[in-house]
A protein has these predicted regions:
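Aromatic- and Gly/Pro-rich donor/ligand-binding loops
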Residues: 1-85, 132-133
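Conserved acidic residues
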Residues: 30-34, 91, 141
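Alpha-helix capping/helix-boundary segments
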Residues: 42, 99-100
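Catalytic donor nucleotide-activated moiety binding site of glycosyltransferases and closely related
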Residues: 69-72, 103-104, 147-183
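A short beta-strand/loop micro-motif in the catalytic core of glycosyltransferases
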Residues: 91-97
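Helix-loop-beta element that forms the nucleotide-linked donor phosphate-binding surface
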Residues: 102-119
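A short helix/loop element that forms part of the nucleotide-sugar donor recognition site in Leloir-type
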Residues: 126-137
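Conserved donor-binding/catalytic core segment of Leloir-type glycosyltransferases
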Residues: 136-150
Length: 183
């Protein structure tokens, strides 16, 4: 619910549908000045979302920009074979991790700028203001979970044992909207 409310308020969706499985660049795709990708773990080869679309392969090459993209691994040998071509086709590259910049150079011979996580572009005061506007307040003491990838059910009992009765907030649980409501 909170994600939908955020989308309705802040995201202006186009009426056109991008056919991500097609190699065709529809005319409207070419009408944009730039296509930007970048997110936490967007290029992690262990994630199912690390497809050609995460590397903007549907967009005209000259309009591709990677802004603070994250690979989230340190071993170049775990990269998918296509990564060299896909990353090499992005003319403007910035990544979050120093090691990611090194990997890009190893794979493509290109340099990538290291740029901070975009959430750090917001001041502490702004973050505090948004937290104060939250409709639901967090308990005074709680444990936070943030698991990359798929968390297996077998870890649930271990988590409950370790947090010793504290409230548990799973930041990647899209169904736990009570912690995602902001004014």
């Amino acid at each position: 619910v909170a994600f939908q409310e955020f989308d309705n308020k802040y995201i202006n969706y186009e009426s056109e549908l991008l056919h991500l499985t097609s190699d065709d660049n529809e005319p409207w795709v070419k009408s944009y000045d730039a296509w930007v990708c970048g997110s936490d773990q967007i290029w992690n080869p262990n994630y199912p979302t690390a497809t050609r679309n995460a590397f903007l392969q549907f967009a005209p090459e000259s309009r591709r920009i990677a802004l603070s993209a994250s690979i989230g691994i340190s071993d170049v040998n775990t990269m998918l074979p296509e990564y060299s071509e896909w990353i090499g086709s992005i003319p403007y590259l910035s990544v979050r991790e120093e090691r990611a910049a090194e990997i890009i150079t190893e794979l493509t011979g290109k340099n990538a700028e290291v740029f901070l996580d975009p959430t750090m572009l917001i001041s502490l005061e702004k973050w505090n203001q948004m937290a104060d506007q939250a409709e639901t307040k967090l308990p005074s003491k709680f444990a936070v979970g943030y698991f990359l990838g798929i968390r297996e059910k077998k870890y649930d009992a271990y988590i409950q044992q370790e947090i010793k009765g504290l409230a548990y907030v799973d930041l990647l649980n899209g169904e736990a909207t009570e912690y995602l409501k902001f004014g």
